[in-house]
Amino acid sequence: RNNLGGQAFWSLGGLFLVDTPEQRRLGIRDSHDLALQDWMGTAGFDRDEDHWPREWAKAYVAFAAGEKRGWLQAMGHRLFPVVGWAERGGYDAMGHGNSVPRFHITWGTGPGVVEPFERRAREHAKTGRITFKFRHRVDALDMTGGAITGVSGKLLESSSESRGESSSRTETGDFAFKAQAV
């Protein structure tokens, strides 16, 4: 209950965005094509089994260059007017890393990233669209016909520890949930 948002809460709040007003204001020239070239150069997809990771990368870069910023803004997310250069790469966009700054820092850092999502999730919980299952440790994913159709694991005893404090790992039972898709 006290840790909704997980590790994102503790983060600096940096988000990968492409060709934004913040970048343009700082004179950073970016584009979908450049970001995709950087991503593909870093990932080094070169095997048959890289097909779906490659497709995911293409979709994510398209999202980051398109609707991601507006979608986040519509939920109340705000950015600092600076852009950092995490995972800095070469300037030629041919190797590992970002060839231009793309690390947009959230106003409020990690808690600022979590807040709009937490608010939205809690609203859905009030209407029954989401059911939170705190203190459930997932140990296995169940597959049927190549799709994940369930999760199972251990129930942990209740804990009222504050965020960042160690909580009990004492197991009190088992659980399993099934669905058409998880």
Stretches found by the model and what they are:
Residues 12-61, 75, 80-81:
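Glycine-rich active-site loop/strand segments that organize a redox cofactor
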Residues 10-12, 17, 21, 112, ...:
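A broad "ordered helical/assembly scaffold" signature
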